[in-house]
């Protein structure tokens, strides 16, 4: 194979039913999709998706053997007010902490500093590293270090040629 993996940008929380305009996890699975992105900041903001709904979507996606890229992140106001670490922990705890160890192997966490998406602003490599370490420690608090170390955490903020080397030089990014 080419190593290329397909990902969907969302899926509905129900496997089937009359939900015009929505695409179910089972439809994506039947098309050979490998991953589904859930919890993206735009879906949270514009579609009022909360952690409870995302937990249902996670379960539905996993039931169809899709891997989940679970997004978490904070706005600039949340970062500036100092609640960013607690907010991201809450998003993870409420979205995926109901899963068992085996299910967690199918979760990728995507940290997306909302304030750095499409704004031209970027998180510094230190900010990205701090949050990635925090996310791993949140996961370790429930599942232990071995599981936390095995979870892929990806950076979903603005990454461009001018900052890529600095970001990728960080141990956890």
Features from the language model and the residues they span:
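Active-site loop-to-helix "anion-binding N-cap" substructures in soluble metabolic enzymes
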Residues: 1-110, 114-173
């Amino acid at each position: 194979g080419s190593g290329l993996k397909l990902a969907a940008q969302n899926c509905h929380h129900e496997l089937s039913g009359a939900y015009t305009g929505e695409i179910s996890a089972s439809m994506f699975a039947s098309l050979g999709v490998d991953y589904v992105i859930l919890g993206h900041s735009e879906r949270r903001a514009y579609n009022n998706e909360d952690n409870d709904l995302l937990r249902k979507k996670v379960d539905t996606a996993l039931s169809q053997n899709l891997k989940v890229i679970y997004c978490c992140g904070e706005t600039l106001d949340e970062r500036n007010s100092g609640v960013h670490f607690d907010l991201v922990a809450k998003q993870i705890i409420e979205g995926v902490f109901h899963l068992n160890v085996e299910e967690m192997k199918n979760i990728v966490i995507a940290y997306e500093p909302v304030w750095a998406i499409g704004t031209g602003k970027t998180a510094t490599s230190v900010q990205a590293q701090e949050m990635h370490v925090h996310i791993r420690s949140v996961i370790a608090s429930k599942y232990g270090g071995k599981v936390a170390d095995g979870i892929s955490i990806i950076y979903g903020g603005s990454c461009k040629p001018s900052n890529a080397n600095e970001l990728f030089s960080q141990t956890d990014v």
